[in-house]
């Protein structure tokens, strides 16, 4: 499958993963999130961290909020902890996984 519906580079490697949006039959829709990989210890999945800052006017300070997402990692994309990646929403793949990694961002 060539076009997955968003503007990302197709991975150079191929895989036989049916849950891959590029080489399998997984459709993506909804949110697209960019964040930092925290952990790759799960088999075929990653934990992603997204930080956002907001101003608290009363104290004239910024507050940092951290959100963690679990995402499926296809075999054709190689990531390590600390890398920035783009994930896209898909159908629920496991109890806590409803996103899939689509691109490694520099």
From Swiss-Prot:
InterPro entries: NA-bd_OB-fold, Ribosomal_uS17, Ribosomal_uS17_arc/euk, Ribosomal_uS17_archaeal
Keyword Cytoplasm recorded: no
Record keyword Kinase present: no
GO biological process, one term: translation
Family per similarity comment: Belongs to the universal ribosomal protein uS17 family.
Complex and partners: Part of the 30S ribosomal subunit.
Protein name: Small ribosomal subunit protein uS17
Lineage per the UniProt record: Archaea, Methanobacteriati, Thermoplasmatota, Thermoplasmata, Thermoplasmatales
């Amino acid at each position: 499958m060539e076009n997955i519906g968003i503007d990302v580079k197709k991975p150079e490697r191929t895989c036989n993963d049916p849950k891959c949006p590029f080489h399998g039959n997984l459709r993506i829709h909804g949110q697209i999130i960019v964040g930092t990989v925290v952990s790759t210890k799960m088999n075929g999945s990653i934990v992603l961290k997204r930080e956002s800052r907001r101003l608290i006017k009363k104290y004239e300070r910024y507050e940092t909020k951290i959100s963690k997402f679990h995402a499926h990692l296809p075999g054709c994309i190689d990531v390590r902890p600390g890398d920035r990646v783009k994930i896209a929403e898909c159908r629920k793949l496991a109890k806590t996984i409803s996103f899939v990694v689509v691109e490694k961002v520099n």
